[in-house]
């Protein structure tokens, strides 16, 4: 009853209600677009494409696009080109002074960085769209499925549509972030992944019930393990280290009384401050080697065959070793960007606060940096372990690969991380309007 009361309160806040409706509408548009097949392709003859993209690297890529990749949809490229562009721009920000300057200019600089990211996204789409179209026959689409043939008109129009589809998906994500609830790009990926969950479970269930020796028991064991992994993922996302902060008591003149302190408060430093972005970034990079190795000009060479063998098997040893290392690296990198310890120290000093035993200002900033480094290491390792856990599930329990992706890994971590982030935003609206949050009673707390 408390949850129902809280959900009722959500609809009492006009701004929050409008944001939720807009978000749901945008997500529905994205899911609808994922079912719209490119003009000139017979949708009834795409069965082989779906079969060939159920497992391995292509299966994961298809999950990221919510099935659009296997549908030869107008959204077949998904939002991954935008993520790739974001990675490139942020990495270039380390070495290029102009981008470093923009990063320090606040909102105005961020607008310029966003514009650069958009243009780079278009450039990446212009490369990926022809590659996707050329690969369709090798992925199982028969020649008769191309109703107008594979001439220049088909390629030109399809490239324009695929690039436009990616730009439109990028626009949807940005609008959700600005006018809706949650991080739009992450939500688009999450709903795509969720769309593949029922099919994956049904396939695993069908495979298990045909076993004569305890198939249903194995399903129950898998579900228990799944819930445990979800719980571990939630704990990782929610875990914080509290740093005690003391505030000097204000005087009537607006200053601070010397050696007279108010109540003690805390700065919550998250164990995984970077959220799901390291997973998304690392996964975007892991798509590259296998796809390059499978291209026509590479697939017959020794290098191409090695890349395909090592990086197309997402449950293989080397794939997961590199994946885990990238997650750890990106966790440190993204934490450094998203946790501005200098600004935190300055804000603390201006408000009359300090960490007991630590001088305000530079010393406080260095102390917070030290603490973040200490907690980021175990946090990044834990994140990497959960990310590669599906490989262990496949090897130890012979789980269907599509279903195994939800036992930790990119899919589950994105779902959990994005869901919690979105709930926290809703929670903040409720608390600002003097209602208890989603995890509390849902009562109006106005005095």
Kindly give the residue locations of the regions a language model identified.
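N-terminal cationic and glycine-rich segments that engage phosphates or anionic surfaces
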Residues: 1-103, 108-447
């Amino acid at each position: 009853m408390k949850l129902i009361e809280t959900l009722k309160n959500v609809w009492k806040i006009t701004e929050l209600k409008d944001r939720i409706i807009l978000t749901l509408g945008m997500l529905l548009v994205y899911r609808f677009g994922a079912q719209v097949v490119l003009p000139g392709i017979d949708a009834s003859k795409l069965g082989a494409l779906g079969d060939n993209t159920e497992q391995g690297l292509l299966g994961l890529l298809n999950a990221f696009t919510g099935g659009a990749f296997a549908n030869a949809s107008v959204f077949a490229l998904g939002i991954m080109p935008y993520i790739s562009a974001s990675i490139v721009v942020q990495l270039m920000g380390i070495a290029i002074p102009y981008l470093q300057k923009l990063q320090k200019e606040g909102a105005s600089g961020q607008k310029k960085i966003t514009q650069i990211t958009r243009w780079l996204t278009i450039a990446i789409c212009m490369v990926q769209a022809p590659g996707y179209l050329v690969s369709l026959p090798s992925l199982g689409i028969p020649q008769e499925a191309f109703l107008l043939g594979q001439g220049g008109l088909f390629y030109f129009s399809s490239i324009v549509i695929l690039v436009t589809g990616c730009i439109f998906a990028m626009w949807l994500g940005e609008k959700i972030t600005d006018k809706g609830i949650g991080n739009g790009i992450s939500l688009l990926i999450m709903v795509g992944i969720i769309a593949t969950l029922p099919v994956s479970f049904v396939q695993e269930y069908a495979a298990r019930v045909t076993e004569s020796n305890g198939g249903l028991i194995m399903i129950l064991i898998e579900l228990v393990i799944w819930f445990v992994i979800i719980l571990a993922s939630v704990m990782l996302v929610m875990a914080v280290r509290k740093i005690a902060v003391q505030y000097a008591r204000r005087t009537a003149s607006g200053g601070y009384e010397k050696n007279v302190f108010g109540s003690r408060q805390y700065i919550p430093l998250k164990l995984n401050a970077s959220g799901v972005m390291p997973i998304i970034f690392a996964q975007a990079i892991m798509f590259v080697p296998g796809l390059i190795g499978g291209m026509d000009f590479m697939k017959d060479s020794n290098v191409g065959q090695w890349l395909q063998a090592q990086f197309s098997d997402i449950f293989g040893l080397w794939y997961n070793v590199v994946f885990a290392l990238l997650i750890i690296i990106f966790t440190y990198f993204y934490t450094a960007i998203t946790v501005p310890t200098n600004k935190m120290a300055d804000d603390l000093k201006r408000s009359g606060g300090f960490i007991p035993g630590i001088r305000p200002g530079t010393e406080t900033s260095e102390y917070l940096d030290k603490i973040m480094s200490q907690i980021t290491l175990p946090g990044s390792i834990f994140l990497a372990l959960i990310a590669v856990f599906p490989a262990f599930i496949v090897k130890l329990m012979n789980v269907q690969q599509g279903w195994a992706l939800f036992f930790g890994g990119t899919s589950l971590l994105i779902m959990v991380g994005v869901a919690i982030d979105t709930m926290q935003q809703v929670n903040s609206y409720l608390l600002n309007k003097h209602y208890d949050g989603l995890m509390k009673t849902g009562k109006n707390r106005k005095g």
